[in-house]
A protein has these predicted regions:
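N-terminal [4Fe-4S]-dependent radical SAM core
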Residues: 25-56, 63-64, 221, 227, ...
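Conserved SAM/AdoMet-binding glycine-rich loop
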Residues: 57-58, 62, 314-421, 426-465, ...
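N-terminal pre-triad scaffold of radical SAM enzymes
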Residues: 55-61, 76-79, 265-292, 316, ...
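Glycine-rich beta-alpha loop elements in corrinoid/cobalamin-binding modules
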Residues: 93-238, 475-527, 535-548
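A short beta-strand-loop structural module common to alpha/beta enzyme folds
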Residues: 84-96
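A glycine-rich phosphate-binding loop feature that marks nucleotide/adenosyl-phosphate handling sites
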Residues: 211-222, 329-334, 358-364, 427, ...
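Canonical Radical SAM [4Fe-4S] cluster-binding loop centered on the CxxxCxxC motif
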Residues: 69, 270-306, 617-634
C-alpha cells in the first residue's frame, strides 16, 4: 500500500476552511494563561506551505522551554533549508490549553499554519529528559494518533525522535517508528532524502523502514524484540534481517561544515534562555563519571572563531538580542576563549551586547575574562563543585579542588559579583555523611571569602545559592551500573545538608524533588516493559512530571503495581558488571571496556586525566578513527 496522503482540498474551499479554523483556534488561544505559547507568527518564523513534505517538530514541554533548546532551533532550520520540506513547530500544551482542546473537540496544532498534527507526514519529538515522556502521549492523543507504533496504519504520520534519551529509548521504543542516534544535522538530511525516495517509489511503511534502517544512526525499534529472564532484561532479538546488529551513533566530524542555524525565531514572550547561543564546541574531554553528555558527545570538535563571529553578526542584526551565551559542556576549555570574549565585547560595544559563560569549570575560571564580561553587565555566575570533599570529587573524576573554587569565587567577588550559584549532587557513589557536611563547610568558606572583603566592596551582601540535585545513573557512563539511593535516604541527606547550612551568612539552599529523580533513574535504565507503566500513569492523569506542582505520585505508583513492576527494580539496584544492558544494542562509540575500567578506577578514587593531555582510549580500538588525541600517549593517572 502506498504511504501517501493528500492534506489539501483545492481552491477557495480550503481558504475558507483555514479562516474558520483559525478563528476558532484563536478564540481558544485567547482563553489560555499565556496565549503567546500558541500564537506563532514570531519574527523569523519560516513559512513554506507549498513544500512537498510536512514535518512537525515537537518539543514535549512548554513553549518557553522548547524555544530555548538550541538543538531544536538547529533542526528547524536544517529541515526548512530543504526545498522539499516544511518544518513547523508544536509544543506540549499546558494543562489549560489541553483542557480547552478536549472540551471543544479540537486537535493539537502547529504554530506556523495551525495545521492539526495528524495531517503531517512526519512528527518528530526532541527527547531531552525522561520526565517529558507523558507529554509525548498528551500530544499524540490530542492529535488522534494511537500511542503504539503497531496500532498505527499506513496513512498515519511517521513518528520519529532524537536527542540524548535515545541512548536508552527502550521505555518508549514501542511508541516510536524511527529513532535518531547522534548528531542531527546530517542525519536529518539523510533521513529526508531516503524518506522522499521511498514516498516517490510508493513503498509501504515496512519497506520504507527497511530502507531507513540502512542509514547510520537510524534505529527502527519494531525490527527488534526483547527477551527477559529472572525479572530483568536478557537480550534483544533481531526480527528484520536487513536491520543492523547494533545502531552506531552518528557524528558530525567538522562542525564548521555542518549547518549551524538560520535566523533565530524571536518569541513574543520571555523564554528560559532568551539570548543568542553560540555552540563553541561539541563534546567534553574531562570525563566526569556521572555525566552522560560528557561521554555521548565525544569526540571534542571545535568551531573556528570566524564561524562563530559570522553567525553572531547575523543574529545580532536579525534578532535584536543583546546577550550572547558562549555555550558548551565546558566553555572555558575552548582553545580561543581568551580571544573570543574580548573580541565579542569590542565588536558589539556600541550595541551594549553582553557575554555569558554558563558552563565554566572552576579550574578554567580566569579573572581577566571576568572583568571583561562585567564591563557591559554582570550575567549569572554558576560553578559546579558537585561534591563536598576532595575524596568524593576524585571518585567522580571531577578534577578540581577546594583551592580552585575559593580562588574562582574570590576573583568573582573582587570583580564585582555578589551572587553565585554552587551546584552539588546528593547520592553519588560512595557518598557518606562526611561528604554531605563537606558541602556546608565549602559554602561556609565561600561566605567567609566574600565577607573578608572591605565593606564598601560588598554591596547589598552575598547571595550564594547551594543547589543539590540527586544522582541519577545514566547509560554509557562509568556509573551506569550503580544504584540510586532510596527516596528515604535522599530525604535524610537533604535534611542533613539543610540543617548544616543554617546560619551561614548569605547562603540559601535549593534541592531537587526526590520523587522525580527516582522516576528519572527508573526510565534512564529501563526496558520496554515500562511503556505499559507510562501509558497507565498517563491515563491516571500524569502530565508535566518534571514540574513539581504537576507530579502525581499516586498515578505512577498505581501504574507500576498494575503492571507487576516497581520503580525500585530499575532505579535502586546495582547492575552486575557483566549483566546484559537494555541499551547494549546502541553503539555510542565509547568502548564498554573503557567504561568498566573507569568504574573500577572510581572505586579506588583514581583520577583519570583530561583527554586534552593525552588519549585515555575511550574509543577503544577505534580511537584513531574518531579522535585526534590518540597520538598524545597512553592512559595515565594524575
Amino acid at each position: 500500500m502506498e504511504h501517501q496522503k493528500t492534506h489539501y482540498h483545492s481552491g477557495g474551499i480550503r481558504v475558507l476552511e483555514d479562516l474558520m479554523d483559525s478563528d476558532r483556534l484563536n478564540s481558544l488561544i485567547a482563553r489560555t494563561e499565556k496565549p503567546t505559547r500558541f500564537m506563532g507568527g514570531e519574527l523569523n518564523m519560516r513559512m513554506k506551505p507549498d513544500a512537498e513534505f510536512k514535518f512537525a517538530l515537537c518539543f514535549p514541554d512548554t513553549y518557553e522551554i522548547g524555544m530555548s533548546h538550541l538543538g531544536s532551533r538547529i533542526i528547524y532550520n536544517v529541515l526548512n533549508n530543504r526545498e522539499d520540506t516544511f518544518c513547523e513547530r508544536a509544543y506540549a500544551p499546558w494543562v489549560d490549553m489541553e483542557a480547552l482542546l478536549r472540551e471543544n473537540s479540537e486537535k493539537l496544532f502547529s504554530l506556523e499554519t495551525k495545521r492539526p498534527l495528524d495531517e503531517f507526514d512526519i512528527i518528530g519529538f526532541s527527547l531531552l529528559y525522561e520526565m517529558c515522556y507523558t507529554n509525548i502521549l498528551t500530544m499524540l492523543e490530542l492529535s488522534g494518533i494511537p500511542f503504539l507504533s503497531k496500532d498505527r496504519g499506513e496513512d498515519a504520520p511517521l513518528i520519529v525522535a532524537g536527542g540524548p534519551c535515545v541512548c536508552n529509548s527502550e521505555p518508549i521504543a514501542d511508541i516510536m517508528d524511527v529513532l535518531f542516534f547522534g548528531d542531527g544535522e546530517e542525519l536529518n538530511n539523510d533521513f529526508m532524502d531516503v524518506y522522499a525516495s521511498c514516498r516517490h517509489r510508493g513503498l509501504n511503511k515496512h519497506d520504507m523502514l527497511v530502507e531507513l534502517s540502512k542509514i547510520e544512526g537510524i534505529y527502527i525499534p519494531s525490527f527488534y524484540e526483547p527477551t527477559y529472564g529472572n525479572d530483568s532484561f536478557a537480550s534483544l532479538r533481531k526480527l528484520e534481517p536487513a536491520a543492523p546488529d547494533r545502531i552506531k551513533r552518528r557524528i558530525v566530524h567538522d562542525l564548521d561544515l555542518a549547518e549551524f542555524t538560520g535566523d533565530l525565531v524571536v518569541p513574543y514572550m520571555s523564554i528560559v534562555h532568551d539570548r543568542i547561543a553560540l555552540e563553541l564546541f561539541r563534546g567534553c574531554t574531562r570525563g566526569c563519571r556521572f555525566c552522560q553528555a560528557g561521554f555521548i558527545y565525544r569526540p571534542v570538535r571545535e568551531r573556528r572563531m570566524k564561524t562563530l563571529l559570522d553567525f553572531a553578526d547575523k543574529q545580532i542584526k536579525c534578532t535584536g538580542y543583546d546577550e550572547i551565551s558562549l555555550f558548551s559542556l565546558s566553555s572555558g576549555d575552548y582553545s580561543e576563549i581568551h580571544e573570543m570574549v574580548p573580541t565579542i565585547l569590542d565588536r558589539y560595544k556600541d550595541d551594549r551586547v553582553s557575554v555569558s559563560l554558563p558552563s565554566l569549570r572552576i579550574d578554567s575560571f580566569i579573572k581577566d575574562d571576568l572583568k571583561k564580561i562585567q564591563s557591559v553587565r554582570k550575567t549569572g555566575l554558576t560553578l559546579a563543585p558537585e561534591a563536598g570533599t576532595q575524596r568524593l570529587r576524585d571518585v567522580i573524576n571531577k578534577g578540581v579542588n577546594e583551592d580552585d573554587l575559593l580562588r574562582a569565587v574570590g576573583d568573582a567577588f573582587r570583580s564585582g559579583w555578589h551572587g553565585v550559584k554552587l551546584y552539588f549532587m546528593i547520592g553519588l557513589p560512595t557518598e557518606t555523611d562526611e561528604d554531605i557536611l563537606g558541602i556546608a563547610e565549602l559554602a561556609r568558606k565561600v561566605s567567609r571569602e566574600f565577607y573578608s572583603m572591605p565593606k564598601e566592596m560588598r554591596g547589598k551582601g552575598l547571595r550564594c545559592t547551594v543547589s543539590a540535585s540527586t544522582f541519577v545513573p545514566k547509560s554509557f557512563t562509568p556509573f551506569q551500573w550503580e544504584p540510586q539511593i532510596s527516596t528515604d535516604e535522599v530525604l535524610r541527606r537533604q535534611a542533613l545538608l539543610r540543617s548544616a547550612l543554617k546560619g551561614i551568612r548569605g547562603v540559601e539552599f535549593n534541592c531537587h524533588f526526590s520523587e522525580t529523580s527516582r522516576l528519572e533513574a527508573c526510565f534512564a535504565r529501563g526496558d520496554r516493559r515500562l511503556v505499559s507503566v507510562l501509558i497507565g500513569a498517563y491515563k491516571r492523569g500524569a502530565r508535566f512530571d518534571s514540574w513539581d506542582e504537576q507530579f502525581k505520585k499516586e498515578a505512577w505508583d498505581e501504574a507500576f503495581m498494575e503492571n507487576g513492576l516497581s520503580c525500585e527494580q530499575y532505579a535502586n539496584r546495582t547492575i552486575g558488571i557483566d549483566e546484559p544492558l537494555a541499551w547494549q544494542h546502541m553503539d555510542s562509540l565509547i568502548s564498554m571496556e573503557y567504561l568498566k575500567r573507569e568504574y573500577e578506577r572510581s572505586k579506588q578514587g583514581i583520577v583519570t586525566r583530561d583527554c586534552r593531555s593525552g588519549c585515555n582510549g575511550c574509543f577503544g580500538e577505534h580511537c584513531k578513527e574518531y579522535c585526534n588525541m590518540h597520538s598524545s600517549g597512553s592512559e595515565e593517572t594524575e
